[in-house]
Every structure is written in C-alpha cells, then in structure tokens.
C-alpha cells in the first residue's frame, strides 16, 4: 500500500496531468484514507468504509488519466472497466460480479510477482547451479585407484565451476546454446458459458489447465534465455500457492480500487425509451457491489465492503441525478473537471514529464532529425487545437494528437532525407502546415 501523503500524490499527478486540482485532491485524500484506516484499531477499523468518488467532466480532460496514474501510485489491485460492458443479470452479456473476479485475478498476479521478487536472488543461484550442471557434467572417477585422486578431482572441478560461474555472471556465456528439461507451461482454454454460470465455467477451465501440467519437455535455449526460464521455474517452486491466494484476497478486500468509466451511459433519461429496463438493472446490480457484499470466486469468498469505487462520466445527455437515487448515495464525493483552455493545451504540450513535444523529439532523433519548437509555435498549436475543439466536437487533450500528427506528417514521412538537419517549428511553420485545414470547418471535421 502507498504511504504517500495527499500533497505528494497530487505532486506526482501534476507531473502527468495539467490542472484538475479538485479531482486530484479528491483521489489523493481517498488514497491516503486507505492508509489511515489501516492504522486504526480493529473494532473501529471495520466500520470505516471508503467514500466513493464520482468524477464529472467532458471527454479528454484527464478523468481516465488520473485513474491510470493513481493505479501506479497506489501499489494496490486496480481495475478500470466501462460500465457499458455489463448487462442486467439474465440478459446476454457480463454481469457486474465479474468485476470482482477480474480484480482478484489482477491481485493474484500482483501478489505472485511481489512474492517472487522476494525469493529471486535465491532462485537465480539455483538456476545458475542447474546451468553449470549442464555445462560441466560432474566428473566421477571410476575404476581401480580412483579413490586416491578423488580429492584432486573435486578441487579441480570446484575451481572450474567457480570460473564458469564468474563467466556466466559476466554474460560471457549468454550466446552459448544448451539443452535442458523445463516444465511445460499450463495452456489456458477459453470456454464460453451461459450468464450466471461463471463459477462452473471457471472450474472447467481450471480443470483443463491442470491437464498436462508439471510435465517436462526438452528445449534448446541460449544460456541467457535459459537462465530466465529456470529462475522463474525455481522461484515458482519456492512459493506457497495457498499463501499467495490468501494474501491476494486480503489485498483486494482492504486495498482494491475499481474505476467505473462511462457511468453516465447507464443513467436513465426520462424522455428515452427502449433499453431503460436493462440500464436500471445494471445500476441495481451495481448497488450491492458498491455498498458491500460477498462475491464467490475461484480463490474463495471476497468481501467488497472496503473496495474504493471511482466512477466517471461526461454526462452530456444525462445528469448525475438521472442515476437511481440509491446509487447516487453511494458516491458521496463529487468533483467536476474543467474544460481545457488554450493555456492548458500549451502546458500539456511542454510541461508534463512525457509531453507530446518530448515524445516526437525523441522519435525523430532516432533518425538524426532534430525538432526545435519555438514558444510562438507551441502557442499557435494550442490555439488551433482549442479552435478545432470549439468548432467541431470537443474531445479535449486528444485533439493535440491529431493536430501534431498532421503538423509533422511530412517530416516524419521523409525523415531519411532530413538526416542531420534541425527543423524549426515556429508559428509560421504551424500556419503553413495547418492553417488551411484548421480554417475550413468541413476539412477540420474529417482531418483534425
């Protein structure tokens, strides 16, 4: 679990996302409250439930990016899903319980990787020993008089082994091919099952996965690849699968985060008809999950009482009040994200850690083409992106991708001809490349 303070979390998010201070603060406090709850004594700890968040804002302003970056900072099981993927129980499609099943799978993988890191050093030593056994078959003296020289043979063998171990660690044997016996990976089998029968389907899938497991096969690999395969195999042997499952379930129950995107698409609109029953059904199915229930998974029963839910939606056609009242009450913290201004676009282009300008400079530098963006060029790019958003469909920061891609189309295509050159991107260059398209509304609708 992350022990970062809210200010530190916001500072990390600021490196990748421009503006949206209220949303950043809300998720930072929610994440910190997970840690605070763990410090509270047990009887009261069980009563403290997370305060779920509803993020409201147009597309492309950073809702999903905040969730994605939060996942990396949280060091906790995290899943992002679209609410539109789910249908009411009884309809064809996925039911909402599969959210928890997917989350526990992520947690098991995460926990397994964490536990494997703890034993990796020991596993690497054992993998080295297995490779050295193949490279240096033990010389056992046989016949009359063998015992008299046995000690000398062992000493010589030990010295040779240490020499080879040193060369192995220095990477001098990486390209040497060896034959070795490795365990066959378990082959997964995709089985389709009727709605509501996910547990049975999962059991059948597990049964087929175990068939043939544990068998060894002889493979020819380079030493470098063999070392990785054997290290993973040895680390896997050291793990206690039951312990991994128990820790994974506990991690989901105490630290799990679910990001529900496009929640506005399952909101019921009074004037609409048709699919309203199914939409309301999905909302009602979500209720117990968000409030706290117990879901049966192949790893055991999982309680959702302390899982944090973050929902987001543009709410262009529907309003948050169109959600059923019970579900509205499960998301007490609401934050509105602002539409992006020209200044925001300018900051997105240059101020973030992995800004678009830095990305394109790095890409073209691989072909010895150097891009230099002047301040007036950056400003003009931001103005054009903002203008196209206003005239056509507002897709937020994603508009910058289409604008800058169109701007650098010719340079990227003929990069080989520009090798060793520096391309200056100023306002005049931007106008030459984009002005005609940006000013023609019909063209910009299709090109930008």
Swiss-Prot record:
<comment type="function">
    <text>ATPase subunit of a proteasome-like degradation complex; this subunit has chaperone activity. The binding of ATP and its subsequent hydrolysis by HslU are essential for unfolding of protein substrates subsequently hydrolyzed by HslV. HslU recognizes the N-terminal part of its protein substrates and unfolds these before they are guided to HslV for hydrolysis.</text>
</comment>
<dbReference type="GO" id="GO:0036402">
    <property type="term" value="F:proteasome-activating activity"/>
</dbReference>
<dbReference type="InterPro" id="IPR003593">
    <property type="entry name" value="AAA+_ATPase"/>
</dbReference>
<dbReference type="GO" id="GO:0005524">
    <property type="term" value="F:ATP binding"/>
</dbReference>
<keyword id="KW-0547">Nucleotide-binding</keyword>
<comment type="similarity">
    <text>Belongs to the ClpX chaperone family. HslU subfamily.</text>
</comment>
<dbReference type="GO" id="GO:0043335">
    <property type="term" value="P:protein unfolding"/>
</dbReference>
<feature type="binding site">
    <location>
        <position position="261"/>
    </location>
    <ligand>
        <name>ATP</name>
    </ligand>
</feature>
<comment type="subunit">
    <text>A double ring-shaped homohexamer of HslV is capped on each side by a ring-shaped HslU homohexamer. The assembly of the HslU/HslV complex is dependent on binding of ATP.</text>
</comment>
<feature type="binding site">
    <location>
        <position position="326"/>
    </location>
    <ligand>
        <name>ATP</name>
    </ligand>
</feature>
<dbReference type="GO" id="GO:0016887">
    <property type="term" value="F:ATP hydrolysis activity"/>
</dbReference>
<dbReference type="Pfam" id="PF07724">
    <property type="entry name" value="AAA_2"/>
</dbReference>
<protein>
    <recommendedName>
        <fullName>ATP-dependent protease ATPase subunit HslU</fullName>
    </recommendedName>
</protein>
<keyword id="KW-0963">Cytoplasm</keyword>
<feature type="binding site">
    <location>
        <position position="398"/>
    </location>
    <ligand>
        <name>ATP</name>
    </ligand>
</feature>
<keyword id="KW-0067">ATP-binding</keyword>
<dbReference type="InterPro" id="IPR050052">
    <property type="entry name" value="ATP-dep_Clp_protease_ClpX"/>
</dbReference>
<dbReference type="InterPro" id="IPR003959">
    <property type="entry name" value="ATPase_AAA_core"/>
</dbReference>
<dbReference type="Pfam" id="PF00004">
    <property type="entry name" value="AAA"/>
</dbReference>
<dbReference type="GO" id="GO:0009376">
    <property type="term" value="C:HslUV protease complex"/>
</dbReference>
<keyword id="KW-0143">Chaperone</keyword>
<dbReference type="InterPro" id="IPR004491">
    <property type="entry name" value="HslU"/>
</dbReference>
<dbReference type="InterPro" id="IPR019489">
    <property type="entry name" value="Clp_ATPase_C"/>
</dbReference>
<dbReference type="InterPro" id="IPR027417">
    <property type="entry name" value="P-loop_NTPase"/>
</dbReference>
<dbReference type="GO" id="GO:0051603">
    <property type="term" value="P:proteolysis involved in protein catabolic process"/>
</dbReference>
<feature type="binding site">
    <location>
        <begin position="60"/>
        <end position="65"/>
    </location>
    <ligand>
        <name>ATP</name>
    </ligand>
</feature>
<feature type="binding site">
    <location>
        <position position="18"/>
    </location>
    <ligand>
        <name>ATP</name>
    </ligand>
</feature>
<dbReference type="GO" id="GO:0008233">
    <property type="term" value="F:peptidase activity"/>
</dbReference>
<keyword id="KW-0346">Stress response</keyword>
């Amino acid at each position: 679990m992350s022990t970062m303070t809210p200010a530190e979390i916001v500072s990390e998010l600021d490196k990748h996302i421009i503006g949206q201070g209220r949303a950043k603060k809300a998720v930072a406090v929610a994440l910190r409250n997970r840690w605070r709850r763990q410090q509270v004594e047990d009887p009261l700890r069980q009563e403290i439930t997370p305060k779920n968040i509803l993020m409201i804002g147009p597309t492309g302003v950073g809702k999903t990016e905040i969730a994605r970056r939060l996942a990396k900072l949280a060091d906790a099981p995290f899943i992002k899903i679209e609410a539109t993927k789910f249908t009411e129980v009884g309809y064809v499609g996925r039911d909402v319980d599969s959210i928890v099943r997917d989350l526990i799978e992520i947690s098991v993988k995460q926990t397994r990787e964490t536990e494997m890191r703890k034993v990796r050093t020991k596993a690497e030593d054992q993998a080295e020993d297995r490779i050295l056994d193949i490279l240096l078959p033990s010389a056992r003296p046989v016949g009359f008089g063998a015992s008299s020289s046995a000690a000398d043979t062992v000493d010589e063998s030990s010295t040779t082994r240490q020499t080879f171990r040193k060369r192995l660690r220095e990477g001098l044997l990486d390209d040497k091919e060896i034959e070795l016996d490795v365990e066959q990976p378990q082959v997964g089998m995709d089985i389709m099952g009727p709605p509501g029968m996910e547990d049975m389907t999962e059991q059948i899938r597990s049964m087929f996965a175990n068939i043939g497991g544990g068998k060894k096969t002889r493979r020819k690999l380079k030493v470098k690849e063999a070392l990785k395969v054997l290290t993973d195999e040895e680390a896997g042997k050291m793990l206690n699968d039951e312990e991994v499952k128990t820790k994974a379930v506990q991690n989901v129950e105490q630290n799990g985060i679910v990001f529900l995107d496009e929640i506005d698409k399952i909101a019921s609109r009074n004037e609409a008809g048709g699919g309203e029953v199914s939409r309301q059904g999905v909302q009602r199915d979500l209720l117990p999950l968000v409030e706290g229930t117990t879901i049966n998974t192949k790893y055991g029963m999982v309680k959702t009482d302390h899982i944090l839910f973050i929902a987001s939606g543009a709410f262009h056609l529907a309003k948050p009040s169109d959600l059923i009242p019970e579900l509205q009450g499960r998301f007490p913290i609401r934050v509105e994200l602002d539409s992006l201004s020209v200044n925001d676009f300018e900051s997105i282009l240059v101020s973030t850690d992995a800004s678009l300008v830095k990305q394109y400079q790095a890409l073209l530098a691989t072909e010895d083409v150097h891009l230099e963006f002047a301040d007036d060029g950056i400003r003009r790019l931001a103005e054009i992106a903002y203008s196209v958003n206003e005239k056509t469909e507002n897709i937020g920061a994603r508009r910058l991708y289409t604008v800058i891609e169109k701007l650098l189309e010719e340079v990227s295509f003929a990069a080989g001809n520009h090798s060793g050159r520096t391309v200056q991107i100023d306002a005049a260059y931007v106008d030459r490349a984009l002005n005609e398209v940006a000013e023609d509304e019909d063209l910009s609708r299709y090109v930008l």
